[in-house]
Structures are given as structure tokens and as C-alpha cells.
Amino acid sequence: MLIHFVLHGKTDDSYLKEGVMKYTKRIKHYISFNELIIPSLKSTKNLNYEEIKQKEGELLLSKLKPSDTLVLLDEKGVQFSSLEMAEYMQKWMNQSLKNIFFVVGGAYGFSDEVYQRANFKLSLSKMTFSHQMIRLLFVEQLYRAFTILNNEPYHHE
């Protein structure tokens, strides 16, 4: 299984970049993992939020094949404990999924078309985080899931 971590635009703050790189490197010890950056839209001054979501959605959907699994990191998604997240990752690995795309939406979220295409929606918290901050939170939780699955001493109950 190859995990694609899809981001809209580059990570702005150096402390977030460093954290994401740290956990990305660790994740690669367990599974094939790559970061896919969808470039930020240019000339959005004359676009409303819905038009921005639509254009970002079109860029995302153009990267997917019908067989790809699309998981949206979304405040309306299912919430897991870290142990439940690990169990879900194991379930997906057991299903022999080839490509799974975990997507952090842009600042305004996802278009209706992206929601319709999604196989699953995952929420990391009831709280709202910036689309920049969620990048670090997600890769840490993904790393934690793999340490749980491998009985390594990172996670403590």
C-alpha cells in the first residue's frame, strides 16, 4: 500500500515543516509514503469561497484513479482514538488497497464533488485547526498508529 498525503499549497511555518518532515521520515520505516502538494491557486481575488473549493477540488480529483481510496481529513468525519486509528490502518492494509490518499483540504474545505468521491471522512478532533496545523497533527497520528501496530513503545495508554 502506498499512502499519499495530499496538501493544498506549501506548509508555511518552519516549525510545522520540521515536524512534518520528522514524522514523514519515521512513517517511511513502516510503509511507502509520499507527500503530494497541489499548488495554491493563483488570482483568487475575484473568486468566492465556493469557486475556490471547486477549482481546488478539480485539481485533486484529476490526480485520482477510480481504484484509489480517498480519505478526507474533515471536521465532519469519524473520530477515532489512536488505537482505533491503528486498527483502521490495519484493516486497510488487510484489504490490500493499492493507493490511499489522505487529503487536507484548503482553507475553505472541500467541494461537493470531492465529498461525493470520498471513500471515508476522518476527523482528528471536534475542534477546528488551520489546514496548516492539521498536517503535523495527522502525520504524528499516522506514525503513532504504526508504532501501535508494531508494538513499539511510543504510545502509552
Where are these regions (language model features)?
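Loop/turn-to-beta-strand initiation segments
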Residues: 2, 98-102
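Hydrophobic/aromatic beta-strand patches that form the interior of the parallel beta-sheet core
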Residues: 6, 36, 71, 120-122
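S-adenosyl-L-methionine/SAH cofactor-binding core of RNA-modifying enzymes
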Residues: 32-33, 39-98
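Short histidine/acidic/glycine/proline-rich micro-motifs that form metal-
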Residues: 9-14, 76-77, 128
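Structured adenosyl-cofactor binding patch, chiefly the S-adenosyl-L-methionine
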Residues: 112-156
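N-terminal beta1-alpha1 ligand-phosphate binding loop
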Residues: 1-27
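Rossmann-fold NAD(P)-binding glycine/threonine-rich loop
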Residues: 105
